[in-house]
Amino acid sequence: MKKFILPAAAACLSAAIFALSGCAPQKSPSGVSLMGVQPADVGLVSECDYFVAAEPAATTRVNAAGLHFAGDIQQLYGSENGYPQAVVVAKNSLIVNNPHFLKSFLAEVEENEGWLKTASAETVISAVSSHLPEGTTPTFNAKNLTSEVISRCGIHLVYAADDRERVENFLKEMSDVDEQSVGKVKDEFFCEELGDIVNPPADISVYAPDGAPALALAKLMHEENTFGQTSVSYNVVPSSNIQAYVTGEDPAADICILPLNAASKLLGDGSTYRMLGTVTNGNLYLLSKDGASVTSENIREELNGKTIGVIQLNNVPGLTLKIILEKYDIDYEVIG
């Protein structure tokens, strides 16, 4: 299948510039045109017929911009168990020196899935917002964080020992549509067994991007669970900054949640961090302005000749959409 990247007209460098300057990108006459957009611009870029966004931010934009849910990316992808979107990793030093703590930590992450079904929206929001940088607010609020929205966030812990094949398959699929988007993962990347060593308490730092990944730790943050350590600090940060906490000479994060493709590129050799498991399993949705419905039966008819604005076009959201378009033999071009 042919895939093209078209230059934007003149000095149009982003979806925001297109919207503000009136300088329209070159649209594909056939197939699908893909345009990267910022989360806050979902629903606002006039050139786009559809948008791809992740829950819970998708519901926020539906309510704010008068959009409609048009399609479930997970269903279009075609896997009953979704796909490994975000993974949790831990420093090798922590895995070696205090695996007992990690066992307890992961057990609570498992419990979190059930807790989210019964906790009030206010409790969940308070848990997350209290761990954001001062002066910032979470990507969701009490009006859009319903039990239905949480159910669409794909939050479910799958241990690395049970998820290796699915992870490797999805990495290959992402590489097939953009070989620069992922890194090669070695056997050492997967932490498939934890020991029982218990060492003296330590200070542990945990980082997660705002959105569904942060919800995967909401119970732990609500309870300020330290698991008998000196301290466990939970930090929710903008998704665009998450890689900074696992890179450098002395990375800040002892435990971190980050997108699978980023984890493979930054940590795939297993030399500093190893993957403990997958925590979100697909939470992407196709949104429309006109109430159209996109299914596996009509996807080619509905999307042909249309422009789709995609958050994080070069990461899991955009890569997953490209995988789906290839699956249904739909040509696409990246514009803007």
Model-derived features: positions:
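Secondary-structure end/capping motifs
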Residues: 95-177
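Short, glycine-/small- and polar/acidic-enriched structural segments
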Residues: 26-56, 66-72, 202-336
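Pocket-lining segment of extracytoplasmic ligand-binding domains
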Residues: 38-130, 260-262, 291-292, 336
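Short boundary motifs at domain starts and secondary-structure transition points
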Residues: 78, 195-200, 299-301
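Solvent-exposed, acidic/flexible segments
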Residues: 51, 78-83, 95-102, 106, ...
